[in-house]
Amino acid sequence: MSLFLGIDTSNYTTSTALYDSKTGEMVQQKKLLPVKEGQLGLRQSDAVFHHTAQLHTLIEELLKDVDTSKIAAIAASSRPRPVDGSYMPCFTAKILSSAMKIPLYTFSHQEGHISAALFGSQRTDLFDKQFIAFHVSGGTTEAVFAKGFGTGFSVELAAHTLDLNAGQAIDRTGLMLGLKFPCGPQLEQLALKNTEKIKVKPTLKGCDCCLSGVENLSKKLIDEGKSPEYVSAFCLKYIEQTLSEMTKRLLEKYGELPLLFAGGVMSNQIIKNSFEEKYNAIFAPPQFSADNSAGIAYLGYRKYNNVHTRV
């Protein structure tokens, strides 16, 4: 048996993935949650309902031409972070595991992002090393000091936002510009058309950041009649400079460790290009950077392989 099924549910996306450990191929099926125009997200109860409905369709599509007897294990995200008191429902994964009589391994959504970024960037060597990992999305903006132990990661919070998450700042700015949620890709396209110079001054407290100013300043620029292209570029520049200053301070604190960036915001090419140039940072391809279950599926493979190697 060489196949590993991964399931992940986040604030914005329902994701499934199938990893073939013989060929190294990763196949994904994912779908955004249905958010009404002008809204910033869903209530938790509504999100759970839609995740459950979408998972059935996605899994059926993912496995339609697959010999399911070759699935060795299922892996699912059961909590946002690898810390106590953190929880996400994974009912579908439990039902499938029981029905198929195969192991179920659970990991955190954050571990999944880190794993996907390492897999996608072909840096799986870091599963056994120390590094600094940023997880920057609509639900999280933080950096952790990560220690890989082969089948997962122990993490120590190193820095985080004190108010808005980066993805929230992007979406709120985008909605003020009349864009459709989630606004990241549209905001990036507008920003790329800007030709004016932009200066920003990020706000940090130690290694932690404050991003609520992005929303307020973007609104001020809109009220002043600045173009959507300029406002979009300003928003992304502010976030890029904030993350850059956080990175600089963390390297001063922890030393010259490898830098990994994951999460939907880090699939933005403007930010990505800047960080690759400044810090030689590790990024995953876009399909492994935004919310996905590929990292969860790969963690399931590593866990299964570790357990059965020791037997």
Task: Describe each PLM feature range.
Residues M88, L104-G112, H135-V136, T161-L164, ...:
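Active-site nucleophile and cofactor-binding loops and adjacent substrate-binding regions
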Residues S2-A76, P80, H109:
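N-terminal beta-alpha supersecondary unit
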Residues A76-K101, Q269-E277:
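Short Gly/Thr/Asp-enriched flexible loops that form oxyanion-binding sites at enzyme active sites
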Residues H113-A117, A284-V311:
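Glycine-rich phosphate-binding/hydrolytic loop that grips phosphoryl groups
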Residues A76-R79, S137, L260-N268:
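Glycine-rich beta-strand-to-loop/alpha-helix junction loops that act as flexible
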Residues S2, G6-Y12, A17-Y19, V27-Q28, ...:
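A short helix-loop
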Residues Q189-L259, V265-E276, N280-F283, Y301-R310:
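A contiguous, well-structured pocket-lining segment that forms one wall/lid of small-molecule binding clefts
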Residues M1-S2, T106-I132, Y298-R302:
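Conserved phosphate-binding catalytic cores of ATP/NTP-utilizing and phosphoryl-transfer enzymes
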